[in-house]
């Protein structure tokens, strides 16, 4: 735990192959949290092949050129470590927890999976079957359907964010081990990766263990330049997708967001909390669920990437309340855009966001996550300490201007998934 008021001492090192390393030693702890983020998320997928990045990442955990999937998992279990690999819009992130004494072995296993995956035919087929099964389950899940439809409304087919990270069923069924290897060679590179460690370990030892584990990780040729195409909404787009045998509707209402590197992003995070991030500190969340009882849940999120990740409000609603829940949400947004928001609203949102940071600092995993955003997007060496002050510095005028710039109430994408909506009288 990082004591309240104390400084997170982040120390950095870069390996000759380009891998950037950041470590925050925390005295009094035996455990460590380890995150390896490779900038190989959706934005780095081949055009027209949504799902390849996630498929590749999942297959990387199914055996290496040195040991099969069971042996690799057994070696991880032997040191009491837990690990996973997730893919988002920007990065493929390997996350693990272990004792500080076992970091060397953990990094060696991590390097095996990331640098020398086998992509054995049997294991590739297993990942394919699991992914197809998940996609089939998602086709009956109103939350997943609403998100898929919303992305299709906002992002054109060639855009990397058009599909969910899990991808398109046709792509998953057709992808070959050779395609996964090609994606791995092109995208999984040390010069686009960041290793972050927080917890009970000294920086010098961590740097030495990382050098030993990742020294052979190399890349062919210069890193491919990538950018995310911009998108905009000229008006309101709406689609209802009927999901059989359901009694609840799920709603996604949203807009294209802004890059994490945009100078207005911190103000956008505060604006998101003022608007609908939860039901305690947010205007729409509190009114729609707690005051009017129109939704089972309400929350909003603002994605982080180098492009316009989704900025969405999500709701679970009785079909008879869908239209009113959406209308009330937009009315609350119009109040913010119109300047009808108070300093109390702002202070409550800032208290919630800074409080979440304080909670995150109580665990190695939370500290590592705070560090990772700053390292991946190169937000400055003092990002972890500066960020709470930046949240507090956001003004009411900035919240209003941010809402006007990015959340126009009359230009939005709306996806509704569930049973048919009742016909209005």
Regions found by a protein language model. Give the residues of each.
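A generic structural signal for well-ordered coil/turn residues at beta-strand boundaries
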Residues: 9, 32, 90, 235-237, ...
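Short beta-strands and strand-coil junctions in structured, solvent-facing domains, enriched
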Residues: 41-44, 203-204, 259-262, 320-323
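His/Glu-based metal-binding/catalytic segments typifying zinc-dependent metallopeptidases
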Residues: 22-26, 33-40, 222-281, 287
């Amino acid at each position: 735990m990082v004591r309240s008021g104390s400084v997170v001492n982040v120390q950095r090192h870069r390996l000759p192959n380009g891998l950037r390393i950041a470590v925050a030693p925390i005295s009094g702890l035996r455990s460590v949290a380890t995150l390896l983020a490779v900038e190989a998320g959706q934005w780095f997928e081949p055009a027209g092949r949504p799902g390849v990045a996630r498929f590749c990442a999942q297959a990387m955990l199914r055996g290496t050129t040195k040991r099969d999937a069971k042996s690799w998992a057994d070696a991880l279990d032997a040191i009491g470590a837990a690990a996973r690999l997730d893919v988002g819009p920007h990065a493929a992130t390997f996350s693990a927890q272990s004792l500080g004494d076992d970091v060397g072995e953990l990094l060696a296993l991590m390097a095996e999976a990331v640098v020398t995956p086998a992509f054995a035919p049997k294991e590739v087929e297993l990942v394919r079957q699991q992914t197809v099964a998940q996609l089939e389950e998602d086709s009956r899940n109103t939350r997943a359907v609403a998100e898929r439809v919303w992305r299709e409304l906002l992002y054109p087919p060639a855009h990397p964010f058009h599909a969910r990270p899990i991808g398109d069923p046709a792509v998953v069924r057709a992808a070959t081990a050779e395609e996964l290897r090609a994606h791995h060679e092109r995208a999984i590179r040390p010069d686009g990766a960041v290793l972050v460690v927080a917890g009970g370990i000294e920086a010098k030892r961590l740097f030495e263990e990382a050098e030993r584990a990742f020294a052979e990780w190399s890349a062919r040729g210069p890193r491919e330049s990538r950018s995310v195409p911009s998108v905009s909404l000229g008006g309101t787009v709406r689609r209802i997708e009927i999901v059989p045998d359901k009694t609840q509707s799920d709603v996604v209402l949203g807009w294209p967001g802004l890059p994490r590197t945009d100078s207005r992003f911190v103000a956008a995070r505060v604006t998101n909390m003022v608007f609908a991030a939860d039901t305690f500190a947010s205007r729409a969340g509190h009114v729609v669920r707690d005051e009017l009882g129109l939704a089972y849940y309400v929350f909003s999120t603002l994605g982080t990437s180098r492009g316009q990740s989704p900025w969405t409000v999500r709701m679970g609603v009785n079909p008879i309340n869908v239209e009113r829940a959406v209308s009330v949400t937009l009315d609350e947004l119009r109040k913010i855009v119109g300047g009808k928001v108070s300093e109390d609203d702002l202070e409550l949102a800032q208290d919630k966001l800074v409080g979440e940071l304080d909670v995150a600092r109580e665990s190695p995993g939370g500290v590592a996550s705070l560090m990772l955003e700053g390292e991946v997007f190169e937000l400055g060496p003092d990002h972890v300490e500066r960020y709470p002050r930046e949240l507090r510095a956001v003004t009411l005028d900035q919240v209003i201007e941010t809402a006007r710039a990015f959340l126009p109430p009359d230009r939005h994408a709306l996806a509704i998934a569930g049973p048919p909506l009742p016909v209005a009288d």
